[in-house]
């Protein structure tokens, strides 16, 4: 979450008259994140989240995201629920941007997750994958392997010494992944961005999963590989086998991986590292300087990519 577009209080008050959520008491921009402009709303009926969808999010995809959250919520997945306007509309417009209000989830995201947090994530991810199997809408992953080359080319427009230093490794990794990427793994709805700032906990129990705006149809095991990247490294970039083992064990208690998924999981983890390295690089050089956003360190994913590139066995991942 983040703030790119500011809103005028009077415009917000008019916008809220379309909803049955009470009168506005206060609102505040939410700093975390990089995709959309988000605000915490406090009304006479409680707290809500207002999202203004910025240009990276296609307006045509918004019904998919909102319907998916409804679908998952109906199946017991703790995720935000869109608030419907009085006339039945789900997506409105505010400050020249598509806008929606969603429910507020209790809990906090964990900056230094422990083993139990990782286990909860493994369980929650598997439950999400199963809950999405009967979702009737679909969305292509617009940040999959076929999109990474274009993203890398856009990063190279910037004259940066580090990009030049590591460019050859990135290009060789792109070529390797494109040549070896699988196309026949179990597929369905994935979150595709289940980082620690998108998962809430209350007393070590997972209480919510948020930010479904990268959700799409792709390999379940790719989503799991993203979580290995996001949850199983320490601040010094060392891979924590105990955390990984707990995450993987809990996931497989609910949705066991088939042999072909196990065969490709290291490759998928390499791909996930490269995907987040490239998107963070792009955002690092292209985020407007006046935006209310904390940019994320792209080189964290350089270290993770190097780790996964040197993994030779499943036991090194935690299986």
UniProtKB/Swiss-Prot annotation:
Superkingdom: Bacteria
Catalytic activity from the UniProt record: L-homoserine + ATP = O-phospho-L-homoserine + ADP + H(+)
Enzyme class of the recorded protein, top EC level: transferase
GO BP term, example: threonine biosynthetic process
A Pfam cross-reference name: APH
MF terms (GO), sorted A to Z: ATP binding; homoserine kinase activity
Record key words, sorted: Amino-acid biosynthesis, ATP-binding, Kinase, Nucleotide-binding, Threonine biosynthesis, Transferase
Pathway the protein acts in: Amino-acid biosynthesis; L-threonine biosynthesis; L-threonine from L-aspartate: step 4/5
EC number: 2.7.1.39
Record-linked PANTHER family: AMINOGLYCOSIDE PHOSPHOTRANSFERASE DOMAIN-CONTAINING PROTEIN, AMINOGLYCOSIDE PHOSPHOTRANSFERASE DOMAIN-CONTAINING PROTEIN-RELATED
Record family assignment: Belongs to the pseudomonas-type ThrB family.
Protein name: Homoserine kinase
Protein's gene: thrB
């Amino acid at each position: 979450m983040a703030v790119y577009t500011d809103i005028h209080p009077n415009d917000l008050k008019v916008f809220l008259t379309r909803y049955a959520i009470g009168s506005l008491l206060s609102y505040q921009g939410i700093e975390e994140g990089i995709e959309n402009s988000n605000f915490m709303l406090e009304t006479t009926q409680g707290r809500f989240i207002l999202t203004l969808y910025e240009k990276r999010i296609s307006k045509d995809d918004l019904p998919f995201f909102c319907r998916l959250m409804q679908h998952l919520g109906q199946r017991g997945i703790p995720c935000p629920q869109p608030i419907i306007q009085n006339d039945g509309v789900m997506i409105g417009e505010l400050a020249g941007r598509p806008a929606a209000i969603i429910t507020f989830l209790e809990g906090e995201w964990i900056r230094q997750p422990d083993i139990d947090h990782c286990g909860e994530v493994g369980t929650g991810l598997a439950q999400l994958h199963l809950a999405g199997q009967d979702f009737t809408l679909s969305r292509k992953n617009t940040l999959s392997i076929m999109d990474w080359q274009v993203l890398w080319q856009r990063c190279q427009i910037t004259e940066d010494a580090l990009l030049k230093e590591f460019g050859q490794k990135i290009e060789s990794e792109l070529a390797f992944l494109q040549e070896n990427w699988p196309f026949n793994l179990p597929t369905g709805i994935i979150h595709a961005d289940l980082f620690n700032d998108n998962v809430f906990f209350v007393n070590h129990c997972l209480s919510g999963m948020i930010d479904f705006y990268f959700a799409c149809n792709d390999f379940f095991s790719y989503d799991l590989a993203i979580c290995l990247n996001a949850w199983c490294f320490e601040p010094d970039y060392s891979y924590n086998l105990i955390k990984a083992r707990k995450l993987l064990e809990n996931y497989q208690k609910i949705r066991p991986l088939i042999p072909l998924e196990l065969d490709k999981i290291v490759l998928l983890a390499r791909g996930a590292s490269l995907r987040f390295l490239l998107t963070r690089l792009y955002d690092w050089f292209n985020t407007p300087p006046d935006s209310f956003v904390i940019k994320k360190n792209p080189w964290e994913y350089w270290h993770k990519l190097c780790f996964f590139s040197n993994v030779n066995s499943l036991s090194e991942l935690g299986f």
